[in-house]
């Protein structure tokens, strides 16, 4: 049975910068949908929620009021997208402050272990903090040991 964990961290606590030489750009709704979709489906090939997306799935998310391409970070190597961190701000919480989410995070397996995921997540957290968000959260499968380890280093619990 699949178990999903919801992890949190304060954005009032310091966000440790990550030194890297990666090229980060933000998602362009005209240029990147098909390229991002190919990578997303490759990374999440057997994932029940995130895998096997069609362009309509992405377009549905992009039409949501929370979608902001400035919070959708891509790592590019040799003009190819190799990783991403897509953030989301939940504004619809009754009597609560908005909360930021690291919505979808992925790195091509050919580039795993290089620190791309950590650098992208850090970029996402810095973006959320700059938007005035004080709390961040994410969902992760309980059996995703690599993801849980990464998120712990970023202050999530």
Regions picked out by a protein language model, each given a short descriptive name:
Residues 112, 121-129:
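A conserved short alpha-helix in the GNAT/GCN5 acetyltransferase fold that borders
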Residues 23-38:
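A short beta-loop-alpha structural element at the N-terminal edge
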Residues 1-21:
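Acyl-donor-binding surface of acyltransferase catalytic domains
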Residues 128-139:
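Conserved GNAT acetyl-CoA-binding A-motif
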Residues 1-2, 114, 118, 142-157:
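Conserved active-site alpha-helix within GNAT-family acetyltransferase domains
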Residues 47-105:
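A conserved beta-strand-loop-helix scaffold within acyl/acetyltransferase catalytic domains
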């Amino acid at each position: 049975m699949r178990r999903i964990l919801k992890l949190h961290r304060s954005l009032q606590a310091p966000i440790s910068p990550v030194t890297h030489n990666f090229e980060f750009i933000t998602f362009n709704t005209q240029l990147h949908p098909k390229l991002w979709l190919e990578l997303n489906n490759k990374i999440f090939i057997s994932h029940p929620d995130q895998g096997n997306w069609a362009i309509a799935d992405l377009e549905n998310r992009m039409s949501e009021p929370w979608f902001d391409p400035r919070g959708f970070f891509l790592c590019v190597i040799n003009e190819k997208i190799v990783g991403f961190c897509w953030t989301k701000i939940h504004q619809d919480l009754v009597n609560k402050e908005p909360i930021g989410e690291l919505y979808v995070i992925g790195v091509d397996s050919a580039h795993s272990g290089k620190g791309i995921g950590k650098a992208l997540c850090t970029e996402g957290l810095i973006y959320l903090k700059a938007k005035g968000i004080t709390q961040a959260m994410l969902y992760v499968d309980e059996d995703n040991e690599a993801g849980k380890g990464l998120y712990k280093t970023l202050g999530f619990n």
